[in-house]
């Protein structure tokens, strides 16, 4: 499967950012592509406890992770917001992912255009992605 094309199509269909990592190294980033940033920072990936799983930075700033079994790839989904995007959330996100300040206005516009989704809806997206990528069904409530 062409995982990069899959990520691009997911972002295009949902407007929820997604990144593809191979052994913790960025292969694709939807936000990086939109912002015109080269994403080269290595992510230290902790062993997953569940697949898929939540990776929350704060209660209002969530990511999800789907390990693509039998490969070295991880799909990082998000950020996802269950509350309206505020300046504080934008600043927090920029700090967490080291986005330069000169991208703040464009990033704010992008983040504000993303759908606001509940934790349960986000879990449903992760379960769907897990089924698509790994051929396994997981109930959204099992992700919590």
Language-model region placement:
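Juxtadomain coupling helices with adjacent low-complexity linkers
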Residues: 1-3, 10, 77-144
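A short beta-strand signature within small-molecule sensing/ligand-binding domains used
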Residues: 53-68, 72-77, 82-92
């Amino acid at each position: 499967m062409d995982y990069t094309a899959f990520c691009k199509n997911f972002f295009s269909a949902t407007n929820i950012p997604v990144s593809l990592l191979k052994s913790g190294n960025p292969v694709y980033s939807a936000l990086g592509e939109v912002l015109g940033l080269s994403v080269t920072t290595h992510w230290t990936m902790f062993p997953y406890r569940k697949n898929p799983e939540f990776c929350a930075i704060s209660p209002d700033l969530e990511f999800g992770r789907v390990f693509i079994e039998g490969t070295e790839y991880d799909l990082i989904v998000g950020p996802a917001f269950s509350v309206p995007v505020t300046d504080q959330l934008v600043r927090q996100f920029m700090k967490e992912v080291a986005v330069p300040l000169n991208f703040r206005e464009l990033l704010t516009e992008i983040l504000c255009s993303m759908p606001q989704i509940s934790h349960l809806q986000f879990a449903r997206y992760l379960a769907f992605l897990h089924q698509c990528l790994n051929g396994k069904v997981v109930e959204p409530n099992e992700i919590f």
